[in-house]
Amino acid sequence: ENKKHEVSASGANYLWINYFYSYLKRGGRAGFVMASSATDSNAERAQRRRLVETGHVDVMLYVGNNFFYTKSLPCTLWFFDKGKPEALQDEVLFIDAQRYHTAVTTTLNEWTPWQLKNLSAIVWLYRGDVEKYRDLLEAYRCRASELAPLFGGEAGEKLMGIGAATDFAPAHEAMLAAIEQQ
């Protein structure tokens, strides 16, 4: 609010965020998109701090340009969790994914299903949900086994032999070498 008692656009962002938060039920989770200016504006630093101090801001994901048809500006995905475990009450996971995307066109970016799974894996590990992460690694192993015959030779053998997470690096290097030879 300025001296004329007018609410600024960025102040309106926090009015909306607080309104949204106040209607979230106990134990509920919610996510929404906000302009990146709502995340880094100095004018609303105190409001942002109060919101974070509730312990219910769970994850913030910074998204780069061109993710929406009508706006090309970056944004931030906010996720609230009123059922957040006590051990995480003083923590907020911030993921900078502004350069993690696939270009669909010169004016539109998106996340592939695998990129979404990777972003989800970061959140799962932050929340201590190791089983979901193990399931994702198993899906990667299965996919590597499906792709192995396409590469043949040393690359195919290394892809077929993937077992532990440490086996991915040599398999990846062999696969890249096989691609370069084509």
Regions found by a protein language model. Name each.
Residues 1-182:
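A conserved structural/catalytic subdomain of Rossmann-like adenosyl-cofactor enzymes
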